[in-house]
Amino acid sequence: MLILDRSSPQIFISNEQQDVSIDLQSAQRLVVLFLELQKVSTDQVYVYFLDDTALAQLHDEQFSDPSLTDTITLPIDKPGIASFPHVLGEAFVSPKAAMRFLEQYTEDQLYHEISRYVVHSLLHMLGYDDQTDEDKRIMQEQEDVSLSFLAEHQALLRPAV
């Protein structure tokens, strides 16, 4: 687990899967720059990269649905709400889900898709929803804007070296 210094929000990143190599510092950079782009202040964010079995088990525990999914978000403190420490939430991401979704891919395409899953979870923490077609359209637009910004700043996920 890697943690940023205390002058920044604490970004807790944990890679608990072995399907895809994840550079933990790239995950931290993605979260920090996303928060800056969205102008969100928080004390803590948690991101866990899990294998399919662990994510399906969490899906069952949280939503009584044992099916595979790509990401689960557990928002904790809403942005702008006073709490200390302010914990924006927890993101649980399956890198292997990106492999299944893409089927054939380059390394860059794979890490872009996994980055999308992290951004998707972060947007849920900010209150975005994807229950209706209009909500999905708005969320997809925000994902695309965020991913473009992150790519420009070389802040997408990358493999560990």
Swiss-Prot record:
Principal localization reads cytoplasm
Its source organism is Chlamydia trachomatis serovar L2 (strain ATCC VR-902B / DSM 19102 / 434/Bu)
Q: Needs which cofactor?
A: Zn(2+)
Q: What family does the entry list?
A: Belongs to the endoribonuclease YbeY family.
Cofactor binding, note field? Binds 1 zinc ion.
A GO BP term here is: rRNA processing
Sum up the protein's function in the record's words: Single strand-specific metallo-endoribonuclease involved in late-stage 70S ribosome quality control and in maturation of the 3' terminus of the 16S rRNA.
Residues noted as binding Zn(2+) in the record, renumbered to the chain: H120, H124, D130
Tell me the gene name. ybeY
From the UniProt record, which GO molecular function terms apply? Answer: metalloendopeptidase activity; RNA endonuclease activity; zinc ion binding
What protein name does the entry list? Answer: Endoribonuclease YbeY
Location of this chain's protein in the cell: Cytoplasm
Show the SUPFAM superfamilies listed in the entry: Metalloproteases ('zincins'), catalytic domain (SSF55486)
Report the EC code(s) recorded for this entry: 3.1.-.-
Kindly state which keywords UniProt assigns to this record, in alphabetical order. Cytoplasm, Endonuclease, Hydrolase, Metal-binding, Nuclease, Ribosome biogenesis, rRNA processing, Zinc
State the GO CC annotations. Answer: cytoplasm
